[in-house]
């Protein structure tokens, strides 16, 4: 579960390395899970890239350490909390996605991120 002040690694090549959650988008939401959109501040970034430190960006959560329970009875858990930076059209800013992503992103209409990911779990 991601909440305000949570740090996430960035799983794309947009230029940011770490982001900190500012707000979970939605009506009075406290926690974000896989597939939820958050507003975040860039805390660590690579130089000469598209995203700079202290930029405020939107991102979609693609991996969480918290257990994700599926309707089939399976549960899945990742090693880190990760997000992909997106623009207002819900398209990723980067051109590559690193690491596995959850299948729930396809149900939330983030098909571009799913197609860029090397593995969908």
From Swiss-Prot:
Organism lineage reads as: Bacteria, Bacillati, Cyanobacteriota, Cyanophyceae, Synechococcales
The transmembrane residues are none
Does Chaperone count among this protein's keywords?
no
Subunit info? Part of the 50S ribosomal subunit. Forms a cluster with proteins L3 and L19. In the 70S ribosome, L14 and L19 interact and together make contacts with the 16S rRNA in bridges B5 and B8.
Is Hydrolase one of the keywords UniProt gives this record? no
Q: Name one GO cellular component term.
A: cytosolic large ribosomal subunit
Q: Which family does it belong to?
A: Belongs to the universal ribosomal protein uL14 family.
Question: What Gene Ontology terms for biological process does this UniProt record contain?
Answer: translation
Instruction: Alphabetically list the UniProt keywords.
Output: Ribonucleoprotein, Ribosomal protein, RNA-binding, rRNA-binding
Q: What is this protein called?
A: Large ribosomal subunit protein uL14
**Matching CDD domains:** Ribosomal_uL14
Q: What does this protein do?
A: Binds to 23S rRNA. Forms part of two intersubunit bridges in the 70S ribosome.
């Amino acid at each position: 579960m991601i909440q305000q002040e949570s740090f996430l690694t960035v799983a794309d090549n947009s230029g940011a390395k770490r982001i900190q959650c500012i707000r979970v988008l939605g009506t009075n939401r406290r926690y974000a899970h896989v597939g939820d959109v958050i507003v975040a501040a860039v805390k660590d970034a690579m130089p000469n890239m598209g995203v700079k430190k202290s930029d405020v960006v939107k991102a979609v959560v693609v991996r969480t350490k918290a257990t994700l329970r599926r309707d089939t009875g399976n549960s899945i858990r990742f090693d880190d909390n990760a997000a992909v930076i997106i623009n207002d059209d819900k398209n990723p800013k980067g051109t590559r996605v690193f690491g596995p992503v959850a299948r729930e992103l396809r149900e939330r209409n983030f098909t571009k991120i799913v197609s860029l990911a090397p593995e969908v779990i």
